[in-house]
Amino acid sequence: MAGENDLNDRVEALEVRLAYQDETIEALNQTVTAQWKQIDALTRQLAALSERLDQAESSAGAPANERPPHY
């Protein structure tokens, strides 16, 4: 009987650990999903800013050979 109780206690302890691990995995999954959404949004924002910078550089043209205002 003592061995059977010990086995039941061990199984119960494993079930508790498994339940906590499932909760942890779910929390980590939610965190990773949120981070990927943020990374995706930041990537799109960076691409848009890069395009705006390219457009600004191309529309500005070459700098004129003018003297600076302090001359």
Curated annotation (Swiss-Prot):
Entries under Pfam families matching the protein: SlyX
Top-level taxon: Bacteria
InterPro entries noted in UniProt: SlyX (IPR007236)
SUPFAM superfamilies according to UniProt: MPN010-like
Transmembrane intervals: none
Region named Disordered: 52-71
Family membership: Belongs to the SlyX family.
Name of the protein described by the UniProt record: Protein SlyX homolog
Organism the protein comes from: Rhodopseudomonas palustris (strain TIE-1)
Phylogenetic placement of the source organism: Bacteria, Pseudomonadati, Pseudomonadota, Alphaproteobacteria, Hyphomicrobiales
Gene name of this polypeptide: slyX
